[in-house]
Amino acid sequence: MNITRILGVVTTVVILYSVQVTAQFFGDVQQAMRCVAKLMPCQPYIHLSIPPPPLCCNPMKQIAEKDVSCLCTAFKHPDLLRFLALTKENAIKILDSCGINHDPSVCNKTNPSSPAALPEAATSGNSFSTKKNTALAITFFGFSFVFLGMII
C-alpha cells in the first residue's frame, strides 16, 4: 500500500510540473501570436518602397508606444514571424517607414517585460505576470493536493 501511495504522489508531482511548464510556454507563444496578428496588415508593405498606410502604421504605433514587450516577444519567436514572411529586420524597417521611433536594444534586456527594462507606458496591460501567477497557483494547489494525499 505504501508503494502505491508513493507512486501516486510522484505521478501527481510530474503531471503538475508539466502543466506548469506548459502554461508558461504557451503563455509566451500566445502573446507572440497576438503581436504577430497585429503585424498582418503590414505584410504587403514588407518589400515595397512606398510608405505603409495607416491600416498598418496605427497598430504598429500602438505596439511601439504602449506594448513594447509584445514586439520583443514576437522577436523571440522567429518562426512565428516567418509565418508572415517577416524578419526582425523587416519589422524594424516597417517601424521606420511608419515614422515610429523604436529602440531595438530594449528587447536585449534580460527581462523585457520587467518595468525597469521598459518605458512606463509599455508595462500597462502586460499579461506576463498574470500568466506566471496562474502557473504558480496551479503549482500551489497541486502540491496542496499531493500533501493532502500523503496525509490520508
Swiss-Prot record:
A lipid is attached at residue 124 (GPI-anchor amidated serine). Gene3D superfamilies: Plant lipid-transfer and hydrophobic proteins. Coiled coil: none annotated. Keywords: Cell membrane, Disulfide bond, Glycoprotein, GPI-anchor, Lipoprotein, Membrane, Signal. It is a lipid-anchor; GPI-anchor. Glycans are attached at residue 108. It is found in: Cell membrane. Disulfide bonds join 42-56, 57-98, 70-107. SUPFAM superfamilies: Bifunctional inhibitor/lipid-transfer protein/seed storage 2S albumin. Transmembrane segments: none annotated. Residues 1-23 form the signal peptide. CDD domains: AAI_LTSS. Residues 125-152 form a propeptide. GO terms for cellular component: plasma membrane; side of membrane. Its main location: membrane. PANTHER family: BIFUNCTIONAL INHIBITOR/LIPID-TRANSFER PROTEIN/SEED STORAGE 2S ALBUMIN SUPERFAMILY PROTEIN-RELATED (PTHR33044). This is Non-specific lipid transfer protein GPI-anchored 8. It comes from Arabidopsis thaliana (Mouse-ear cress). The lineage of its organism: Eukaryota, Viridiplantae, Streptophyta, Embryophyta, Tracheophyta.
